[in-house]
């Protein structure tokens, strides 16, 4: 039975298979359930696409997630969002015909650059804010903004930034969002606290990315997930000397408004776009590449703060820690026959 009622086009699905429409070339990437191929249109010679090929057997039980991703991508048409052009639902595989993006990941490109300034970082964040603001205006929350999902469109020096991977995205009309999801280090406090949340979680993630763009290392880091989450929930980060001494006060103010623990007080995308660090000329223009690149290389090598994770399982772990902590406290109270202050659930 087909997963999808129709292709991306307005008419009924054609009888032609994807391989009658496209020539498949090299494998661009491989995931747990899919491969991405370079493909050329047979009707428009030289027009190249990225085709995501998803095995239906591996997809079993996850159909709703894929349907959601396709629904979101069909809804979004923006200069800084990777486009979905077509879908093919065939016997063994589902195919997504996507815009081809060849410029590489954000942080890898910064490391390879010869020079890099605070103003460059401001321009990058502006593009992300414009795209995410467009998503939010259309009722879509990405929920997994991180450097790996920010790609350069091509190899040109002035290439635009593209947002990709909408696998965890959700539309506001699909109900209250409370599912724990995202990536360690980039997830907002309210998600970890299991509170209902909305668009503000994306703004927090942009704040984390902006922080890293200006120093090369993440604002929150710990080998222990429990400690990492405790830092995030409390909003415990610093603008460390000497690395932040060369960064403008305007940039620090901007980040503080994005990484605000209270989602109600946190900037919206429009608020952020109006901040002088984005809309004015307060971003410094001196070269910070040396410092940023050194730290980025170290951070990228660790990969611990980049890995994907099962947030629901992580939160269950934190709940167990809390229960264990409370149990130990009660046992100690009983043995000493005197009150004792509560043990905190987290340790930063």
Swiss-Prot record:
Q: Activity regulation here?
A: Activated by Ca(2+)/calmodulin. Binding of calmodulin results in a conformational change that generates functional binding sites for both substrate and ATP, and thus relieves autoinhibition and lowers the Km of substrate binding. Must be phosphorylated by ckk-1 to be maximally active but this does not appear to be required for activity in AFD neurons.
Residue positions of motif Nuclear localization signal 2: 71-78
Locate the region Calmodulin-binding: 298-319
In the UniProt annotation, what is the result of changing residue 305 to S?
Answer: In FLP neurons; prevents the binding of Ca(2+) and calmodulin, thereby inhibiting nuclear translocation at 28 degrees Celsius. Prevents nuclear accumulation in unc-68 background mutant that has permanently elevated calcium levels
Name the reaction it catalyses. L-seryl-[protein] + ATP = O-phospho-L-seryl-[protein] + ADP + H(+); L-threonyl-[protein] + ATP = O-phospho-L-threonyl-[protein] + ADP + H(+)
Q: Which residues of this protein are catalytic?
A: 144 (proton acceptor)
Q: State where it is primarily located.
A: nucleus
Return the annotated region ranges for Autoinhibitory domain: 278-318
**What EC identifiers does the entry list?**
2.7.11.17
Q: What is the lineage of its organism?
A: Eukaryota, Metazoa, Ecdysozoa, Nematoda, Chromadorea
> Motif (Nuclear localization signal 1) spans which residues?
7-22
Q: Which organism is it from?
A: Caenorhabditis elegans
Q: What is known of its domains?
A: The autoinhibitory domain overlaps with the calmodulin binding region and interacts in the inactive folded state with the catalytic domain as a pseudosubstrate. Nuclear export signal is required for cytoplasmic accumulation in unstimulated FLP neurons which occurs in an exportin-dependent manner.
Q: Which cofactor does it need?
A: Mg(2+)
Question: SMART domains per the record?
Answer: S_TKc (SM00220)
Its protein name is: Calcium/calmodulin-dependent protein kinase type 1
Q: Which GO molecular-function terms appear in the entry?
A: ATP binding; calcium/calmodulin-dependent protein kinase activity; calmodulin binding; metal ion binding; protein serine kinase activity
| InterPro entries, A to Z | Kinase-like_dom_sf, Prot_kinase_dom, Protein_kinase_ATP_BS, Ser/Thr_kinase_AS
Mutating residue 179 to I leads to what result? Has a larger response to mechanosensory stimulation than the wild-type
Describe the outcome of a gene knockout: Changes in thermosensory behavior and temperature-dependent defects in AFD-specific gene expression. Decreased threshold for temperature-evoked activity in the AFD neurons. Defects in negative thermotaxis and isothermal tracking behaviors. Defective in thermal avoidance adaptation. Aberrant thermotaxis at innocuous temperatures. Inappropriate dauer formation under well-fed conditions. Reduced expression of growth promoting daf-7 in ASI sensory neurons. Changes in thermosensory response of AIY neurons. Increases response to acute thermosensory stimuli.
Outcome (variant: residue 325 to D): In FLP neurons; does not affect nucleocytoplasmic localization
Q: Which gene encodes it?
A: cmk-1
Tissue note: Expressed in head and tail neurons and vulval muscles. Throughout the nervous system. Detected in neurites and neuronal cell bodies. Expressed in the mechanosensory neurons, AVM and ALM, and in the interneurons, AVA, AVB and AVD. Expressed in the right and left ASE neurons where it functions cell-autonomously to control salt-avoidance learning. Expressed in FLP and AFD thermosensory neurons.
